[in-house]
Amino acid sequence: MGRVSLCLVIMFFICSAQKIDAQVQNIREKQDTISATKSLEHIRPENIKKGPLNNALDVLSGQSAGVNVTTNGTDRLAMLNSIRVRGTTSIMGGNDPLVIIDGVTSDIATLSTIYPADIESFTILKNATETAMYGSRGASGVIEIKTKKGTGRGFEISYDGNYGFESMYKHLQMLNGPEYIATAEALGLDYNNGGYNTNFHDVITRTGLIHQHHLAFSGGSENSNYRASFGFMDHNTIVKVNDYRNLVVKLDATQKAFDGRLVGDFGVYGYSSKIHDIFDTRMLFYSAAAQNPTYPAGTDVNGNWVKNSAASHINHPGALLYEKNDSEERNFNTHLGLKFNILDNLILSAFGSYLYSSTGNAQFCPTWVWAQGNVYRGEFKGEDYFTNVSLSYNNAWGDSHLDAVVGAEYLKQVRTGLWVQAKGITTNDFSYNNIGATSSRPFGGTSSSYEDPSLASIMGSVTYSYKDRYSIAAALRGDGSSMVSDNNTFGFFPSVSLGWDVKKEGFLSDTDFITMLKLRTGYGRSGNLGGITSYTTLNTVKENGIVSINGAPTVTMGSIRNTNPDLKWETRSTFNIGFDLGIWDNRLMLTSELYYSKTTDMLYEYDVPVPTFAFDKLMANIGSMSNQGVELGISVVPIQRKDMEMNINFNMSYQKNKLLSLSGEYNGMHITASDITPIGSLYGAGQNGGDNNVVYQIVGQPLGVFYLPHCKGLKENELGGYSYDIEDLNDDGEIDFSDGGDRYIAGQATPKVTIGSNISFRYKSFDIAMQINGAFGHKIFNGTGLAYTNMSIFPDYNVLKGAPEKNIIDQNVSDYWLEKGDYVNIEHITIGYNIPMKSKAVKSLRLSAGISNLATITGYSGLTPMINSYVVSNTLGIDDKRTYPLYRTYSLGLSIQF
């Protein structure tokens, strides 16, 4: 920490420093106007989808090649899981892009709270030649968001609101009560007949309702302006007791002084979100599908939930609705930026921001779900202190133009947490509000946490252009982190890029149909620390248990891992080459880019010998991974008239990932990790006692491949049904389901190709827009089909309607249930009408209507192909019988401006 602070102080006085977030945004935009080296993607107001949209992520989805927005299955609750920019580049973490909102460092959760009506534009940085300006924080891409500010046109008021409802249109087709009874009797099986015919999907779902309102005020003059906005959302989802509320307040003010030489920018953003959910939503869907349909929807005459003691993996769906998993998040950030034009071509900028966040979580499981019940309360707080200054210079002489920036920044974070868990509930009436009324607190269930990492950085960049045709840009950033070992505190990340504006050459200047042609290439390096925390490099201890010492209970402590004093930054090197082509006054625009990136010094837990080491795992920088791909963007304006216009935007991305190595040298010792490691597997009823691993991490393959036995078909078994006929792949005369046995690489879980398309058409005051997304080249393991077609679980658990006819009595995984995951999904269609206004008071009035999740074109036989196909986790590529029911959202919107 001392070295980091000393470096910051020295560089502050030497370099005069830089605002690497807000000022990098502003300065880079100015450089882009004279440089052809950049491959930035801008999503501007005319491209932002109009109509009923829930959050900023709806705006971003499908708009940029290689950018994948992944939500929680099909649960579009406005709570995001992740965004991936050009795939996964690290095993241990740090794969989410850096989010910059008006120059302030943010995260994806905060981005999901911003109202589309507040957004001016998105800018997406993918290559290391652009992200190098953000150093280690931008290793996985950068998403810059500019929000709307005051225009100086006088006082204005705008309102944007929409109302909508959600309707479930597809869920698993399980046996109903009469079918369940008939099947059990036909097979001669004993079963419990509760006397009802209950559709448990109807028990746990409802018609969802959503409404949101956004009000904005702006005003001022050319030298002083402001904009304030307020937003509110109330969302009752299709799952009962699952609700979401969000309140947002935003204020921005800009002041100019000294004839415009001094510009001050002040901003405040705050939100409060509340989520009311149950403890295990996935268990709820599982139980609703597998529950005996002859059981009642509610309690019996004595007020007790009817349970099937033979079905230990599920619970009564109605009982699960009384679980609670409530959370409340409050976030407040403020920033102040000053920009002073010392000379006409010399600008000094300073920026500071403060962020405070608080997240509280409370969980409750009643005694009719867990025998002793369970309660949990936790609160986590965070503070970010961010400051930086910059000095930028630009000059033009003759045919030359030069832009240069030097600067430094400092980021200090503080994270604290406190939580308690207890069992032995006295009464369910207290819920989670009286933990003192419990009789048991599990060891380790009560604890706290603290960390305060810091990051100091220096940076410099130069861009030179000649005759506005040839450009070269170079940048160097150094980051020093308190989380890295003292031996490797600092990392330095250079980049260089070249650009050529071919259209301005003499041999093309008279070619009228070509409006623009630019070529570009670049190389850059960036660092990543996403896989470590403040304590990873330290010899840390934790409590082992309680013993009696001299009659007093004493907590014993012990080390928890091997320490590595040489941990350092992961390094990602990227090369890219691309072009931008505009034809016929840019009514047809093509952009394409080829890239290759390689992650080296990759953090991972490697196998080490004991007793040479105290533990059998050591985190070290040894592995490597590559990503390569091609991106294509097409924009067409086939119709452009006063009363009629049509725009078609299409993007496509091909990507190939490969895990190159998980072995190497550490202090003269060769260490390695397993070449074959399971990532995802099936569990639950019918998956007990088998080798049920499905998705693997295998060296030499993409992250997340299916490594499965090969099924030749079905064969009759001694149980009177059918089993999977598994091929003896290693010809040893036995069928071995274990890892390394009779298995083969059957495909990958992540798409090779993704597409996105936005089509809009306007006729006079009417317009219609449609968003289409798709993915191809990957596979999905239909674990839902395997589990609910397995008749060995019946009648303890319900099965699919087609299961009795197939009569498969087998739980083993194989490629029998591996299917193509290709799909094209119509994300939404919006129809709008801009009412012609004659009133001076009302400037514009727009009505809109929209349908989300309209239709999916796919050959996949399961509920939906839109599962987790991007994030490397235990759900990657697996449809695991716990999928959220499919629903559509129908919305009406109103926008008015005074």
Which residue ranges define each predicted feature?
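Short, small/polar-rich motifs associated with maturation and membrane association
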Residues: M1-A257, L262-Y271, P317, N331-N333, ...
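Short aromatic-centered micro-motifs
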Residues: V99, Y464, V705, L729, ...
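C-terminal beta-barrel architecture of Gram-negative outer-membrane proteins
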Residues: G733, D767-E827
